[in-house]
């Protein structure tokens, strides 16, 4: 992942650059119509509008879509430090339905971060402030091969 060289000394600019770089190639988040609203190191807020094609058989937003929204916020937050991280586990609790046309927000916050792992909480809310879901994700640093073949 390459980032703005100017951002190296500024954690907020580094976070914004890292998240923008990840979003540019994230077809799933783009397909959801996800918008990045706010970025800081270890914290990201994203929003989307529930579309008719996102509804389940009960006429409410499918749980998998809510999970994908939360997972995207989690991914952006754990990658906001400029280190490549991937999900190692996640769980979600659904608390209220979201309907077609509603705007939903996922706010991801860093709970714990080490050189190799991180824990992030994501709260998904409606524009009314009602909580739709709570998500917790665990990430691990992506091991990348260098040109010499060494694993970092």
List the model feature ranges, each with a label:
Residues 1-152:
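Terminal targeting signals and extreme-terminal segments of soluble enzymes
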